[in-house]
Curated annotation (Swiss-Prot):
Keywords from the UniProt entry: NAD, Oxidoreductase
GO cellular component, one term: cytosol
Pfam family name, one: Mannitol_dh_C
NCBIfam families for this protein: PRK02318.1-2, PRK02318.1-3, PRK02318.2-5
Residues reported to bind NAD(+): A3, V4, H5, F6, G7, A8, G9, N10, I11, G12, R13, G14
Family per record: Belongs to the mannitol dehydrogenase family.
PROSITE patterns per record: MANNITOL_DHGENASE (PS00974)
Gene giving rise to this polypeptide: mtlD
UniProt-recorded Gene Ontology molecular function terms: mannitol-1-phosphate 5-dehydrogenase activity
Top-rank taxon, per record: Bacteria
Annotated protein name in UniProt: Mannitol-1-phosphate 5-dehydrogenase
EC class name: oxidoreductase
Amino acid sequence: MKAVHFGAGNIGRGFIGLQLVKSGYDVCFIDVNAEVVEALKTRGAYTVGYAAEEAAVEEVSRVTALNSQTEAERVVEAIATADVVTTAVGPTLLARIAPLLAEGLKQRTTTQNVFVIACENMIEGSSHLQQEVMHYLESTPGNVFFPNAAVDRIVPLQHHEDPLYVEVEPFFEWVIETKALPDDYPVFEGVTYVADITPFIERKLFTVNTGHAIASYLGALFGKETIAESLQDVRVRRGVQSALYETGWLLLEKYGFDPKDHSAYIQKNIKRFENPRIHDEIVRVARSPIRKLGPRDRLVKPARELMDRGIEANGLALGIAAALTYSDPNYSEYSELNTFIEQNGIQETVATYLGLEADERLSQLIVSQYEQMHPMSDSIA
């Protein structure tokens, strides 16, 4: 069995590619990092380490790679004969890989089903990828399926002498939606299959991603450098817990999760964030602020839904305000956001980037919190 995976980064090697190999697939990674691609070609294997008390390593073989910039024709050929195509490139890059993916699907001559799965931190990632691919196809072939998925594993920024070595946390979750799939859908090791993935995507997005993001922005506000360090500060911990209790209430209201089970889920994820063996830097977790502050993402969406139900989203508003105070000169999105705030003010920024009008109660909560913490962070201690 053959799998093509777009993205030979840490998530690709340390999570998706690893599980595909464990499930019996020969994996061809697609990437633009020449060093990583050549190393995968030459060695055909790499090592995954686990950040746990009992440190362990795992050898991953039956892998190769192609450079999508210099070997586009071979990438198309690989897609044309693959059983499975997966991605872990980041939501903003799905449009960039769509032309190659579309061409590969066009050139398929077999009637065998192929499954394209976007393993990204976003709602309905595969559906979004399908829309991007359809810009280059007249119609979706009947034997091509785009099941949506939810994925979860913390893989921090890291640097090793071996360009292929990657260290990950032991925990992972990969959920795939079976709705509209044929009976012969692929079964991967360690993957959960559900008829409706929406509750699982939102549970993960509104717990793991919301909590992680707020820990990073509040941590930065108080001078921390890593997520684990941030959670040691009672002010950050209290802020994260407050936001996750709010999103927890929303998830129970919408999907009927068991209260005890969800409370345990929250605590389990806070413990994951606290793992001292994972050096997860705030600069990594805080990236892509414009997307994360968007009206359909991990912060504003649950806050707005809570407010619509008559619940004050104070914890989420605090996290959103902290995100608006954060700055990183190495990322253009922060330059854009910070410049817009300086030139237009916080109220107009909230309207433009968060989609919240000035008369909305949530907007007022966010602006009030922002004005209290900016520029003096001690005002919210």
